[in-house]
Swiss-Prot record:
Glycosylation sites: 51, 222
InterPro entries in alphabetical order: Oxoglu/Fe-dep_dioxygenase_dom, P4HA-like, Pro_4_hyd_alph, Pro_4_hyd_alph_FE2OG_OXY
Entry protein name: Prolyl 4-hydroxylase 5
Record organism: Arabidopsis thaliana
Transmembrane segments: 23-43
Membrane topology: Single-pass type II membrane protein
Gene label: P4H5
Keyword Iron: yes
Topological region Extracellular: 44-291
Length: 291
């Protein structure tokens, strides 16, 4: 009996050491796996500043993806930047090529007319002092270049081409603007074709020397924390603003994920202070938009 007891006492420490070794081995393996995931970019370490910032802090601008490294024509690399969650808005840098920008402008120039706004009572168009630019519409699939651009927009937004209106090309000269407004409709007429406007893609076809920003006065967040704050005009500092940079495209959603209208999507075009501004807009509807 004593012999068995001694054997039991000798065996117990060996069992304890074995468990410790197993636990240590598991920890080492986990550490190796984590290091591999970090090396592959699947995992990332949290940013120290992220703990002290709010969800809507605009300093937390994230570079989301990189799709090309540019070309010899000076078009630059393409990458996407989240600029706001309320409203949901992202900028696709170098979305268009220089040639595509010039092509859209050349198509629009011969038929430019004074821009109008939607009459909520009739669903038609009317002149208004809140919008002083000139513009024209290009039918959907106008030519091969337009088709390529529209397909790229659809791929970017994950919304079918058929849900989009034709491209609108706009021109703003010094002093011209578009005061804050919503792209979604508040009348029953304009929602009959395709339903509500769900998203807007605004493409900048030219650089602007000063002014001409797209401003979101109702955006939530620390708007003065954006890196380009000092480059903004007085109007641009009245909300979250995007500088008009040639080839860039701004996507923002007029509706929330639950399909309710998003009042934080209120936006406007600041007056051009110096130079002139060319842009092109694509509106998307919930359903197919018949042309």
């Amino acid at each position: 009996m004593a012999s068995k007891s001694k054997q039991h006492l000798r065996y117990q420490p060996r069992k304890s050491v074995s468990r410790s070794t197993q636990a240590f081995t598991v920890l080492i393996l986990l550490l190796v796996v984590i290091l591999i995931l970090l090396g592959l970019g699947i995992l990332s370490l949290p940013n120290a500043n992220r703990n002290s910032s709010k969800t809507n802090d605009l300093t937390n601008i994230v570079r989301k993806s990189e799709t090309s490294s540019g070309d010899e024509e000076g078009n630059g690399e393409r990458w996407v930047e989240v600029i706001s969650w309320e409203p949901r808005a992202v900028v696709y840098h170098n979305f268009l090529t220089n040639e595509e920008c010039e092509h859209l402008i050349s198509l629009a120039k011969p038929s430019m007319v004074k821009s109008t706004v939607v009459d909520e009572k009739t669903g038609g168009s009317k002149d208004s002092r809140v919008r002083t630019s000139s513009g024209t519409f290009l039918r959907r699939g106008h030519d091969e270049v337009v088709e390529v651009i529209e397909k790229r927009i659809s791929d970017f937004t994950f919304i079918p081409v058929e849900n989009g209106e034709g491209l609108q090309v706009l021109h703003y000269q010094v002093g011209q603007k578009y005061e804050p407004h919503y792209d979604y409709f508040l009348d029953e007429f304009n929602t009959k074709n395709g339903g509500q406007r769900i998203a807007t893609v605004l493409m900048y076809l030219s650089d602007v020397d000063d002014g001409g920003e797209t401003v979101f006065p109702a955006a939530r967040g620390n708007i003065s924390a954006v890196p380009w704050w000092n480059e903004l005009s007085k109007c641009g500092k009245e909300g979250l603003s995007v500088l008009p940079k040639k080839r860039d495209a701004l996507l923002f959603w007029n509706m929330r994920p639950d399909a309710s209208l998003d009042p934080s999507s209120l936006h406007g075009g600041c007056p051009v202070v110096k130079g002139n501004k060319w842009s092109s807009t694509k509106w998307f509807h919930v359903h197919e938009f018949k042309v």
